[in-house]
Amino acid sequence: MGGVAAGTRWIHHVRRLSAAKVSTDALERGQSRVIDASLTLIRERAKLKAELLRALGGVKASACLLGVPLGHNSSFLQGPAFAPPRIREAIWCGSTNSSTEEGKELNDPRVLTDVGDVPIQEIRDCGVEDDRLMNVVSESVKTVMEEDPLRPLVLGGDHSISYPVVRAVSEKLGGPVDILHLDAHPDIYDAFEGNIYSHASSFARIMEGGYARRLLQVGIRSITKEGREQGKRFGVEQYEMRTFSKDREKLESLKLGEGVKGVYISVDVDCLDPAFAPGVSHIEPGGLSFRDVLNILHNLQGDVVAGDVVEFNPQRDTVDGMTAMVAAKLVRELTAKISK
């Protein structure tokens, strides 16, 4: 299914429900049942995985993959909705070994586990709108976090998912986090094209909600006047690529999370120069090298409590899946930061 088809499918289903003259009460009941079933699915999977980890013992924190295949809040292409299964395939494809660079073994369930995807399309097919859909994503993340020692590592999807995920993490932990955000764009518009949940507005929602104390944005090279003004409004630390050579030493020795509930890392694949990751919706030359990103991640000091990898667009990837492998490696190295 193409990206446009995925984005318009929800409209077709809403029209069909309207044409069928489904009553508002019946539709509401149906939506509630679908949402409840979705949360039950995630809850039971998380409980199953956590019971195994508790039985095995010797683990304080385990990275837990949760897919959120949502792409309709993208302002350009909606292919990121198809990313989670492609990333999983690349993680386990066998072309590389199962260890992270820091020596964590991904085949050990105490290091990495997986509870599958939030059924976003099925929820949207019954007419659920974005306010409620964002709540479903948040509740799914909280459901994972209820099962100690699981910590969510979320596979997007477009960048709009970061708002409900960070909100859930902050609410569940009882306070704000520090965020390291790697991206070509600041994603801090108050609203983009009238959409407050746009992938270009996720960090405005996070900051106005008080879910982050510090927000560091690294890799920025496509920023408007509003992006800079919003950054100043929220006290965001924006590190643009035009000054990266000067900022490199600082960014490769970050210490975050003291005095708050931990560190959240959000990686938009387009933070990378398109020479390393062409499979993105918004190709922006002049980005970070893959080793730049790994140096920042590996050297970061702080308790990483959750994270996401977003905006990989399989529909723009190379034939051999180069960007899928890049996204998979990002997941592997984030797993090493989260698991303990």
From Swiss-Prot:
Localization in the cell: Mitochondrion
Q: Which reaction does it catalyse?
A: L-arginine + H2O = urea + L-ornithine
Keyword list (alphabetical) reads: Arginine metabolism, Hydrolase, Manganese, Metal-binding, Mitochondrion, Transit peptide
E.C. designation(s):
3.5.3.1
Give the stretches traversing the membrane. none
Q: Where does substrate bind?
A: 185-189, 193-195, 311
Targeting signal (transit peptide) range: 1-24
Superkingdom per UniProt: Eukaryota
Q: In which pathway does it act?
A: Nitrogen metabolism; urea cycle; L-ornithine and urea from L-arginine: step 1/1
Task: Provide the binding site for Mn(2+) 1.
Answer: 159, 183, 187, 268
Q: How is the cofactor bound?
A: Binds 2 manganese ions per subunit.
Q: What family classification does the UniProt entry report for this protein?
A: Belongs to the arginase family.
Protein name as catalogued: Arginase 1, mitochondrial
Task: Give the organism, scientific name.
Answer: Oryza sativa subsp. indica
Q: What is the lineage of its organism?
A: Eukaryota, Viridiplantae, Streptophyta, Embryophyta, Tracheophyta
